[in-house]
């Protein structure tokens, strides 16, 4: 998304594509998308025979694609006759490069990209220029314009997917920049690569028509909870470049003694999965294929950021967190000790517990004494207390003692993670441990990639 973001928006305003198609029509666009995409792809293949050899193999389910696969000589798995059947089977199952998974959320778009590192000299020679351009653009940049970021510290190296070895890259950008991303796909000629994007999240419905009309790209829409479960189980199974993917906080309430420690999720079931994005969904997971959505709440990361924008005038999520880190919520919240003068011993409520979030703001004097940082901190504690309370009740009702918190709300948000960890430990009397994951916000996109590759 380089410096082209502003330029692409101008192109869109000048008529370079139909961004902004009526939303009520987008739910019906899937059938039209498939028909139009198939016709356009057939014509493009006629014009460009090199597409038949765009460094991997055509997706299954098409008679024409099967004939294309049979035309390709050689085996990617080696020259021995014993290895040929397996290699041929892998080639027939895997789609063409590039391999992407998309999770289009209400606030952020998460994209995972598999970069093949085992490309042979023959493949590189036959590789079309648009594919080389895409790979170079995504892997040689860390930032894409002012909003796109590749999380280099999360890169997974030396993975094997569908018989190909490579690295997995993790990229994010704000959802409001999706039109510019689609335009970039058009500029880089994505559609000539016979690319079908596997996408999850609400935006896969919202932007489906734009992908088709602007980028000439098809979206295969996937259930976001299916992708979430599949993604977290896969990432946990491959680990984090030799390190543990899962972790917890020891002594979360003590800033000096607090430690981040690895946790081995070798027996993941049953598992309570708390996905904190713009809103919150809570899932009870009993096996890879057996799970249910227990409940959720509309008070999530979007609520925190939105309220901080209103109360403090901040403009970014990172700015809101920075302000919260310097604030004192006790100047904003009414505590148990403010009501009882100390602990409420009969029900075991300590004096420092919050009795009423923002309760002190009823007083004019206390409103004037509270800083923007105090308001941001109180907002963060309000949201995390609510999520922690609901998660605890769900864990008790479902008789589950492993609670994993994921989602982009937790990105660079150690304060919230420690608050959740302490709340869960305190109110459960040590019976519940809050667990977290290094790739917290990318599991949906990983699940979408696995679906593209048909990995169970």
UniProtKB/Swiss-Prot annotation:
PANTHER family for the chain: PANTOTHENATE KINASE (PTHR12280), PANTOTHENATE KINASE 2, MITOCHONDRIAL (PTHR12280:SF25)
Map motif Nuclear export signal onto the chain.
154-161
Task: Give me the ranges of the annotated region Disordered.
Answer: 16-89
One CC-aspect GO term: mitochondrial intermembrane space
Report the sequence similarity comment from the record. Belongs to the type II pantothenate kinase family.
Kindly state which reaction or reactions the protein catalyses.
Answer: (R)-pantothenate + ATP = (R)-4'-phosphopantothenate + ADP + H(+)
Spell out the protein name for this chain: Pantothenate kinase 2, mitochondrial
What keywords sit in the KW lines?
Answer: ATP-binding, Coenzyme A biosynthesis, Cytoplasm, Disease variant, Kinase, Nucleotide-binding, Phosphoprotein, Transferase, Transit peptide
The cross-references to SUPFAM superfamilies, in alphabetical order and at most eight, read: Actin-like ATPase domain
Skewed-composition ranges (Low complexity)? 28-39, 55-65
Q: Which gene encodes it?
A: Pank2
For this protein, the record's InterPro entries field holds:
ATPase_NBD, Type_II_PanK
Q: What is its main location?
A: cytoplasm
Among the record's GO biological process terms, what is one? coenzyme A biosynthetic process
Functionally, this protein is described as follows: Catalyzes the phosphorylation of pantothenate to generate 4'-phosphopantothenate in the first and rate-determining step of coenzyme A (CoA) synthesis.
User: What does the record say about activity regulation?
Assistant: Inhibited by acetyl-CoA. Inhibited by calcium hopantenate. Activated by palmitoylcarnitine.
Species the sequence originates in:
Mus musculus (Mouse)
* Residues binding acetyl-CoA: 278, 281, 293
Q: What residues bear Phosphoserine in this entry?
A: 55-56, 75
Phenotype of gene-disrupted mutants: Single knockout mice show a reduction in pantothenate kinase (PANK) activity of about 30% and 60% in the liver and brain respectively. Pank1 and Pank2 double knockout mice develop progressively severe hypoglycemia and hyperketonemia by postnatal day 10 leading to their death by day 17. A reduction in PANK activity of about 90-95% seen in the liver and brain and hepatocytes show reduced NADH levels.
Q: In which pathway does it act?
A: Cofactor biosynthesis; coenzyme A biosynthesis; CoA from (R)-pantothenate: step 1/5
As one GO molecular function, the record gives: pantothenate kinase activity
Quaternary structure?
Answer: Homodimer.
Enumerate the subcellular locations listed in this protein's record, separating them with semicolons. Answer: Cytoplasm, Cytosol
The positions flagged as active site in the entry are 224
């Amino acid at each position: 998304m380089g410096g082209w973001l502003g330029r692409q928006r101008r192109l869109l305003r000048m008529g370079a594509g139909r961004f902004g198609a009526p939303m009520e029509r987008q739910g019906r666009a899937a059938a039209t998308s498939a028909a139009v995409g198939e016709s356009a792809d057939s014509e493009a293949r006629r014009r460009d025979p090199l597409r038949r050899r765009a460094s991997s193999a055509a997706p299954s389910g098409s008679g024409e694609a099967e004939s294309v696969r049979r035309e390709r000589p050689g085996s990617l798995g080696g020259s021995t006759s014993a290895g040929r059947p397996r290699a041929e089977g892998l080639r027939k199952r895997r789609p063409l490069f590039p391999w992407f998974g998309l999770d289009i959320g209400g606030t952020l778009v998460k994209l995972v990209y598999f970069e093949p590192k085992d490309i042979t000299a023959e493949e590189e020679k036959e590789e079309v220029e648009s594919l080389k351009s895409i790979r170079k653009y995504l892997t040689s940049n860390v930032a894409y314009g002012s909003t796109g970021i590749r999380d280099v510290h999360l890169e997974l190296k030396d993975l094997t997917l569908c018989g190909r070895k490579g690295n997995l890259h993790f990229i994010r950008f704000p959802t409001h920049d999706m039109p510019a991303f689609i335009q970039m796909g058009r500029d880089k000629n994505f559609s000539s690569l016979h690319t079908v994007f596997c996408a999850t999240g609400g935006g896969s419905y919202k932007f489906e028509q734009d992908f088709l009309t602007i980028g000439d790209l098809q979206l295969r829409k996937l259930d976001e909870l299916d992708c979430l479960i599949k993604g977290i189980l896969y990432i946990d199974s491959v680990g984090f470049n030799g390190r543990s993917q899962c972790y917890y906080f020891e002594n979360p309430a003590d800033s000096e003694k607090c430690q981040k420690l690895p946790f081995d999720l070798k027996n993941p079931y049953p598992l309570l999965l708390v996905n904190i994005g713009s809103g919150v969904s809570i899932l009870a997971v009993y096996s890879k294929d057996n799970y249910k959505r227990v409940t959720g709440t509309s008070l999530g990361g979007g609520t925190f950021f939105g309220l901080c924008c209103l109360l403090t005038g901040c403009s970014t999520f990172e700015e809101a967190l920075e302000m919260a880190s310097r604030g004192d919520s006790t100047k904003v919240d009414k505590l148990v000790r403010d009501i009882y003068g100390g602990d409420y011993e009969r029900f075991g409520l300590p004096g420092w517990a919050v009795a009423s979030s923002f309760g002190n703001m009823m007083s004019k004097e206390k409103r004037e004494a509270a800083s923007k940082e105090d308001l941001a901190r109180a907002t963060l504690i309000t949201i995390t207390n609510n999520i922690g309370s609901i998660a605890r009740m769900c864990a008790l009702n479902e008789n589950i003692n492993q609670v994993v918190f994921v989602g982009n709300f937790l990105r660079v948000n150690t304060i919230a993670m420690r608050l959740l960890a302490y709340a869960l430990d305190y109110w459960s009397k040590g019976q519940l441990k809050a667990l977290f994951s290094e790739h917290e916000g990318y599991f949906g996109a990983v699940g979408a990639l696995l679906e593209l590759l048909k990995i169970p």
